[in-house]
């Protein structure tokens, strides 16, 4: 495939910069001051290179490339399995080793060599025997937790590959006993209940079916400290939950069964007929359920054929086939608002399209909406959504419609402007309509969600307008383009409009709208519906209300009329509030902007015409009609027709807030150097040095072969030559240099025990730190934070010099030696130079010579298409990476003695420099180039760039690191030894992005300028998106062509990609009570939200589980030493830490348990929640009080219950038992209590006043 010169030059430019960074890093590394003398991050230009770098075997990359020219990656995986087992890539020794290499390599191919699952997700591959059956050999795959990162489909395919490997090796099937099967049944259910909710929770029978039929054993290592009751099953090494195996079976094989069947056919693997039958049976069962439910519905339907309006029938069909999905709203976190109930009118109005910063699971909304939801939404905030996917990040689009709000004075305002929103925010009483959510067709395709009926919008209207003009006057006009002047002038003459205006409207119909009288004129002469901007939400209101409104307007309103080319239209309407009465609400629900002045409702131009033109200027009588919506009645009687602008609404709630922040380990670390207890709780190496402490830590030491110097440095401080690693026998303590240990095959010749590269040693921080300070000439740092101990298998410490330079530049290190900055992923395909703070001249240097329409780049306002590996970072990232660049320059100059590289004085100096993008669940980074910065807490990058990390943009956050920092400082020797330690580490980097080898979700992203009429009309038929994949061009249609890299279009522009709130209010508020109050205040203001439901759901899904969980945690808590942080299941008898003598304290406090109690009471007091929920709060408080009262002896002596306590009153109401002196009578222990109680009861009866029992409402209102 031959690429255009500009694209080829771009990739060559990137490679030159990459090679330059590698050259510098190799020079630095060759000095021997690091664990390895070479750069530890290999380059890969494609998927094949990544696979070889991650899992091998050597030489496999070239063969993968050859096979990919002929086959899909699934077939390539099997072909490579064949060749590995045939020995074409070397001798691996045993059958097990052949099987292990084949499975890992195949899984790496299936996951594009990006995720760490092939390394970490498969713990082992063994050949075992069916000893309980016929003693035949079978294959067992041992899965671990990180297999989750590969995704359900790849998990399922790994099982398929395992079966293929089994056949190639001539092994028998796994023949599970009843114990094996029931063990897995228990594990799946227990994991779902006790550990983590599975995306798909299979029934016991489904698990049994799979276990009986899967030809290999799906097993694994223990991942959770949860014991099973089916213990000591033969062949299963653990009695704890095997999380990896559970995920593969439930979320892999069973959840992805339908997709797996397609691969089984494609790959030609037999023995899986049972899965096909399972899928068919499941689908048949769903069809039976559906037909039964439809049969039930048909029973209640009338058998009489009645005449129904078009929209009435559409709504009927819509509601019958696409039910509101309540799943996203079943959990509401305190402080994170519900913005719209499921499919609730007035929620987010669906608008099909893809803005410059949306698509790929991202929604664009008007920035005014962000402001008027109290800025709970900011750029990059995640929302949990009703459809098409489960989540989405929000970005700004000024061409999306904003909210319609009612002010405190009764006026109604359309707020499409961000500045207007800021101005009126404190005057808003109710949000009638939230505004548009621009959602891409590709997201519906990806999630296989039925297309909802499209709401009438400008991009639909302009196509109807152009089509009508072209047919009526035989001219050739095109929407969203600069049309030939002759065609425009000819059409303008026929339409009697200004040619300049017509040209602008055709080019940008979302911003350039005709005046209302002209819109009416167009509708009349072209017989097209009224422009959507002037169409009200007619179908939101009841026809009978419109009938009453028609009468009131006819009889009571003062109307000022105007004319335009013989067309009559209303210029102003005035009517008193008294005359309108309840119909004022009808005007509000119509979304009709109006003002209220001294008891008079005034509807000004153009909204006066928008109200009366559809009603025929009151010249025909509006009459409600059964089975007809308002628009049906209007279209039957009026010359000017309407389309419905408010059919489809989507619900959403707030998810995670946006993020753009430096990555810090907990607690923050500046150098990967162990200091043990000597550094105190802050692990301060400088403090330990100043106090002259000796640290006792497990650390690797090196010995100079020339002078014999021993220490943690890899380079001898005396001779300046590379030292040898010292290996130690853990049994006898004998030490051997690396060359000696190699001769003994790394086993002790005396004890025959495997040698370790580390042992527990005493080190002098003062001596090491002073030498490091002298080396880099850095003396003035306040603190130098190390680690308590190394988590790697080698325990090689980082040079202290690096820590000093990090401390000087105020940056922090991650577990692998790199410095990271995390940010929420956001997509962008086009930008304006002014938005990202970069000059046109600089952009030209970076290869941006033309705008997206092919015109030479001369202005900062031109829209430019983003190149696939360019990134636009947050200004917060710019500030931090500037400090990182200074650190790297200091490192080069002071530690390695090389020239400075970045020489950056301000963050703009970083433009053009390279970074690595990396997602937490992966092990392959992607090289990116910084081209600008925005004032928003997100990481903007091309959707291809995010997909290369196997991410979409539904709320994920990923990291970036400066390329040179990673090349100099990353080392595999620092990676944690535990399972998952290789995740989130750049074990390999992709240098050249190929859209064919990224996550396939981006292949569904649409790349068109507008969606055609055919699409909008098809949505009224509720079609599957798959039926329209040929109608709208997507990335998939361009794969394998040069156009996959360029020429991407968008449907909706925005004035500025950073216009909107920068930080969600959620992050700015204080405690939970304040957050919840603001959340509920907003819920009361949004028409599409029921605040009582919100309060109930917060209590049941967040606050009560938290209160009960914390209460349970208190009774099961560990105890902690304040000095060394050692934890104990039970406190030592003397109350002191046996390790360091420090004070022992609780890990769960009373305050932690009670923290949400006040908030819960506030909700119950102010909102209409169920009695059961109120009682749960009450009883939880009693449990907390009783726990702490009984913890201390003195509390037991004074256990006096509040006489107004609601729980005591409830007991009295239900049992008839009375309260005496604050104690229930059955708590009294005195033998004479009976007589005393009788006396008191008699006295009580003589009193005229009867004590009133306080209700739950009274109790909570008093609180």
Curated annotation (Swiss-Prot):
Alphabetical list of Pfam families matching this protein: PolC_DP2_cat, PolC_DP2_central, PolC_DP2_N
InterPro entries tied to this protein: PolC_DP2 (IPR004475), PolC_DP2_cat_dom (IPR056172), PolC_DP2_central_dom (IPR056171), PolC_DP2_N (IPR016033)
GO biological process, one term: DNA catabolic process
Region (Disordered): 1224-1250
Source species, domain of life: Archaea
Keyword Hydrolase on entry: yes
Keywords: DNA replication, DNA-binding, DNA-directed DNA polymerase, Exonuclease, Hydrolase, Multifunctional enzyme, Nuclease, Nucleotidyltransferase, Transferase
First and last residue of the signal peptide: none
EC number(s) reported in the record: 2.7.7.7, 3.1.11.1
Catalytic activity as recorded in UniProt: DNA(n) + a 2'-deoxyribonucleoside 5'-triphosphate = DNA(n+1) + diphosphate; Exonucleolytic cleavage in the 3'- to 5'-direction to yield nucleoside 5'-phosphates
Basic and acidic residues composition-biased segments: 1235-1244
GO terms for MF: DNA binding; DNA-directed DNA polymerase activity; single-stranded DNA 3'-5' DNA exonuclease activity
Known partners and oligomeric status: Heterodimer of a large subunit and a small subunit.
Family per record: Belongs to the archaeal DNA polymerase II family.
Job of this protein: Possesses two activities: a DNA synthesis (polymerase) and an exonucleolytic activity that degrades single-stranded DNA in the 3'- to 5'-direction. Has a template-primer preference which is characteristic of a replicative DNA polymerase.
HAMAP family: DNApol_II_L_arch
Protein name according to UniProt: DNA polymerase II large subunit
Organism: Pyrococcus furiosus (strain ATCC 43587 / DSM 3638 / JCM 8422 / Vc1)
Gene from which this protein is expressed: polC
């Amino acid at each position: 495939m031959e690429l255009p010169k500009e694209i080829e030059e771009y990739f060559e430019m990137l490679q030159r910069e990459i090679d330059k960074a590698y050259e510098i890093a190799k020079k630095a590394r060759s000095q021997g001051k690091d664990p390895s003398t070479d750069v530890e991050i290999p380059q890969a230009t494609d998927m094949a290179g990544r696979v070889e770098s991650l899992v091998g075997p050597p030489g496999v990359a070239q063969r993968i490339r050859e096979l990919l020219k002929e086959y899909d990656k699934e077939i390539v995986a099997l072909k490579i399995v064949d060749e590995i087992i045939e020995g074409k890539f070397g001798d691996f020794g045993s059958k097990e080793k052949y099987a292990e290499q084949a499975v890992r390599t195949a899984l790496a191919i299936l996951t594009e060599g990006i995720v760490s699952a092939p390394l970490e997700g498969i713990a082992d591959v063994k050949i075992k025997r069916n000893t309980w059956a016929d003693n035949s050999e079978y294959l067992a795959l041992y899965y671990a937790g990180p297999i989750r990162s590969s995704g359900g489909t790849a998990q399922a395919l790994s099982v398929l590959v395992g079966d293929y490997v089994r056949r190639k090796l001539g092994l028998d099937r796994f023949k599970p006993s009843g114990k094996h099967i029931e063990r897995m049944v228990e594990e799946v259910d227990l994991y779902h209940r006790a550990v983590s909710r599975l995306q798909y929770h299979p029934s016991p029978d489904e698990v049994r079916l799979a276990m009986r039929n899967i030809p290999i054993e799906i097993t694994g290592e223990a991942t959770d400290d949860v014991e099973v009751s089916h213990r000591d099953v033969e062949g299963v090494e653990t009695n704890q939950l095997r999380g990896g195996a559970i995920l593969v079976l439930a979320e892999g094989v069973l959840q992805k069964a339908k997709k797996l069947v397609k691969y089984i056919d494609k790959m030609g693997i037999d023995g899986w007929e049972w899965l096909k039958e399972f899928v068919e049976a499941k689908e048949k069962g769903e069809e039976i359920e559906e037909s039964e439910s439809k049969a039930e519905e048909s029973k209640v339907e009338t058998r009489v054929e009645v005449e129904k309006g078009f929209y009435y029938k559409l709504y009927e069909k819509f509601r019958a086939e696409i039910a509101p999905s309540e799943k996203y709203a079943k959990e509401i976190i305190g402080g994170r608002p519900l913005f719209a109930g499921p499919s609730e009118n007035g929620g987010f109005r669906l608008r099909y399209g893809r803005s410059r910063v949306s698509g790929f699971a991202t929604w664009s909304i008007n920035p005014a909406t962000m402001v008027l939801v109290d800025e709970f939404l900011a750029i990059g905030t995640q929302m949990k959504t009703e459809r098409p996917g489960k989540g989405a990040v929000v970005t700004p689009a000024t061409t999306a419609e904003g909210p319609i709000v009612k002010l405190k004075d009764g006026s109604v305002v359309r707020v499409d402007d961000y500045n207007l929103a800021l101005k009126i925010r404190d005057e808003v009483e109710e949000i009638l309509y939230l505004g548009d959510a621009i959602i891409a067709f590709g997201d519906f395709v990806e999630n296989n969600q039925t297309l909802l009926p499209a709401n009438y919008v400008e991009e639909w209207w302009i196509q109807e307008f152009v089509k009508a003009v072209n047919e009526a006057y035989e001219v050739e006009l095109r929407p969203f383009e600069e049309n030939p002047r002759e065609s425009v002038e000819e059409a303008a003459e026929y339409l009697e409009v200004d040619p300049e205006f017509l040209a602008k409207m055709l080019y940008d119909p979302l911003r350039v709208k005709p005046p209302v009288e002209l819109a009416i004129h167009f509708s009349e002469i072209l017989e097209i519906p009224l422009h959507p901007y002037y169409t009200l939400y007619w179908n939101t209101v009841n026809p009978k209300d419109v009938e009453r409104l028609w009468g009131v307007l006819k009889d009571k309103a003062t109307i000022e009329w105007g004319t335009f080319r013989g067309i009559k239209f209303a210029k102003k309407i005035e009517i008193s509030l008294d005359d309108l009465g309840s119909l004022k609400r009808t005007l509000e629900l119509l979304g009709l902007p109006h003002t209220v002045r001294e008891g008079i409702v005034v509807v000004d131009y153009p909204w006066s015409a928008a109200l009366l033109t559809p009603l025929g200027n009151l010249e025909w009588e509006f009459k409600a009609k059964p089975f007809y919506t308002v628009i049906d009645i209007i279209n039957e009687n009026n010359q000017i027709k309407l389309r419905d602008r408010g059919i489809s609404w989507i619900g959403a709630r707030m998810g995670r807030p946006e993020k753009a922040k430096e990555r810090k380990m907990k607690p923050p670390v500046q150098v990967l150097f162990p200091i043990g207890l000597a550094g105190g709780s802050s692990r301060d190496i400088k403090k330990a040095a100043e106090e002259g402490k000796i640290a006792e830590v497990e650390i690797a030491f090196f010995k100079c072969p020339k002078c014999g110097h021993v220490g943690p440095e890899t380079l001898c401080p005396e001779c300046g030559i590379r030292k040898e690693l010292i290996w130690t026998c853990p049994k006898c303590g004998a030490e051997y240099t690396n060359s000696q240990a190699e001769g003994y095959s790394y086993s002790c010749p005396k004890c025959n025990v495997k040698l370790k590269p580390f042992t527990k040693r005493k080190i002098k921080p003062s001596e090491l730190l002073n030498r490091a300070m002298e080396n880099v000439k850095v003396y003035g740092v306040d603190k130098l934070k190390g680690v308590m101990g190394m988590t790697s298998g080698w325990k090689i410490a980082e040079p202290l010099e690096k820590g000093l330079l990090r401390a000087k530049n105020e940056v922090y290190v991650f577990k692998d030696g790199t410095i990271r900055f995390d940010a929420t992923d956001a997509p962008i395909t086009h930008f304006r130079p002014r938005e990202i703070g970069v000059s046109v001249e600089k952009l030209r240097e970076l290869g941006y010579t033309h705008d997206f329409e092919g015109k030479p780049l001369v202005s900062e306002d031109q829209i430019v298409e983003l190149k696939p590996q360019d990134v636009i970072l947050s200004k917060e990232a710019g500030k931090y990476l500037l400090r990182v660049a200074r650190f790297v320059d200091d490192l080069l100059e002071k530690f390695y003695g090389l020239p400075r590289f970045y020489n950056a004085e301000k963050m703009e100096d970083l433009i053009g420099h390279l970074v690595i993008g990396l997602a937490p669940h992966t092990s392959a980074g992607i090289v990116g180039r910084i081209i600008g910065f925005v004032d928003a807490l997100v990481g903007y990058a091309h959707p291809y760039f995010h997909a290369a990390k196997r991410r979409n943009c539904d709320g994920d956050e990923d990291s970036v690191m400066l390329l040179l920092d990673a090349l100099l400082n990353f080392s595999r020797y620092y990676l944690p030894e535990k399972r998952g330690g290789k995740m989130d580490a750049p074990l390999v980097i992709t240098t050249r992005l190929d859209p064919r080898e990224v996550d396939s979700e981006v292949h569904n992203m649409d790349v068109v300028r507008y969606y055609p009429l055919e699409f909008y009309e098809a949505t009224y038929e509720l079609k599957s998106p798959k039926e329209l994949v040929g109608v709208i061009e997507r990335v998939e249609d361009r794969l394998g062509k040069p156009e996959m890299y360029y020429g991407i279009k968008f449907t909706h522009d925005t004035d500025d990609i950073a216009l909107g709130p920068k930080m969600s209010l959620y992050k700015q508020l204080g405690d939970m009570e304040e957050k919840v109050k603001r959340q509920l205040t907003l819920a009361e203001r949004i028409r599409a939200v029921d605040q009582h439901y919100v309060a109930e759901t917060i209590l049941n899904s967040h606050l009560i589980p938290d209160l009960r969980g914390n209460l349970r945690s208190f009774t099961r808590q560990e105890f902690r030493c304040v000095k060394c942080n050692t934890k104990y299941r039970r406190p030592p008898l003397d109350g002191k830490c046996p390790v360091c003598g420090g004070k022992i304290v609780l890990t769960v406090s009373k305050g932690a348990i009670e923290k949400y109690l006040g908030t819960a009471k506030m909700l119950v007091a102010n909102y209409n929640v169920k009695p059961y929920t109120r009682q749960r709060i009450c009883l939880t408080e009693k449990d907390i009080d009783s726990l702490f009262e009984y913890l201390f002896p003195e509390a037991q002596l004074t256990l006096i219950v509040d006489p107004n306590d609601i729980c005591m009153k409830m007991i009295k109401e239900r049992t008839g038992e009375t309260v005496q002196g604050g104690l229930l009578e059955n708590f009294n222990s005195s033998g004479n209590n009976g007589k005393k109680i009788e006396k008191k009861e008699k006295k009580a009866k003589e009193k005229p006043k009867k004590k009133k029992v306080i209700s739950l409402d009274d109790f909570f209102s008093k609180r």
